[in-house]
Amino acid sequence: MSEEKPKEGVKTENDHINLKVAGQDGSVVQFKIKRHTPLSKLMKAYCERQGLSMRQIRFRFDGQPINEADTPAQLEMEDEDTIDVFQQQTGGLC
C-alpha cells in the first residue's frame, strides 16, 4: 500500500480548509483552519469573537456533537462545510 505524500517544502491546497460557524440567530462566522488542528481552537475563537462562554453553547457538525479534541480530518470535513452552534439548554423546572 503506497501513500501519496506531498513533496517536502511544497504546500498542498488541502492543508487548510474554510469552515463556517452558523449561530441560531443566523450569523455566520468563517474560519480558516488546518485539517489536523483540534477544533477546540476554532471553538474558543468563536466564543471570544461572539462574547460567549464554552459552557453556554454546543457545536454540532452533521447533527453530531463536536468534541474539543476532534479535528476536521477526523470528522471528514470539507472546504466550506458548516458547523452549527446551539445555546445550551438548562433546567426545565419552574
From Swiss-Prot:
Signal peptide stretch: none
Keywords of the record: Cytoplasm, Isopeptide bond, Nucleus, Ubl conjugation, Ubl conjugation pathway
Record cross-link Glycyl lysine isopeptide (Gly-Lys) (interchain with K-? in acceptor proteins), residues: 92
Family matches, as InterPro entries: Rad60/SUMO-like_dom, Ubiquitin-like_dom, Ubiquitin-like_domsf
Ubiquitin-like domain segment(s): 15-92
Domain of life: Eukaryota
Post-translational modification: Polymeric chains can be formed through Lys-11 cross-linking. Cleavage of precursor form by a sentrin-specific protease is necessary for function.
Protein's GO biological process: protein sumoylation
Propeptide span(s): 93-94
UniProt entry tagged with the keyword Cytoplasm: yes
Disulfide bonds, paired cysteine numbers: none
Localization annotation: Cytoplasm; Nucleus, PML body
MF terms in GO: protein tag activity; ubiquitin-like protein ligase binding
Cross-link (Glycyl lysine isopeptide (Lys-Gly) (interchain with G-Cter in SUMO)): 11
GO cellular component, one term: PML body
Function: Ubiquitin-like protein which can be covalently attached to target lysines either as a monomer or as a lysine-linked polymer. Does not seem to be involved in protein degradation and may function as an antagonist of ubiquitin in the degradation process. Plays a role in a number of cellular processes such as nuclear transport, DNA replication and repair, mitosis and signal transduction. Covalent attachment to its substrates requires prior activation by the E1 complex SAE1-SAE2 and linkage to the E2 enzyme UBE2I.
Subunit details: Interacts with SAE2 and UBE2I. Covalently attached to a number of proteins.
Family assignment from sequence similarity: Belongs to the ubiquitin family. SUMO subfamily.
Protein name: Small ubiquitin-related modifier 3
Gene: SUMO3
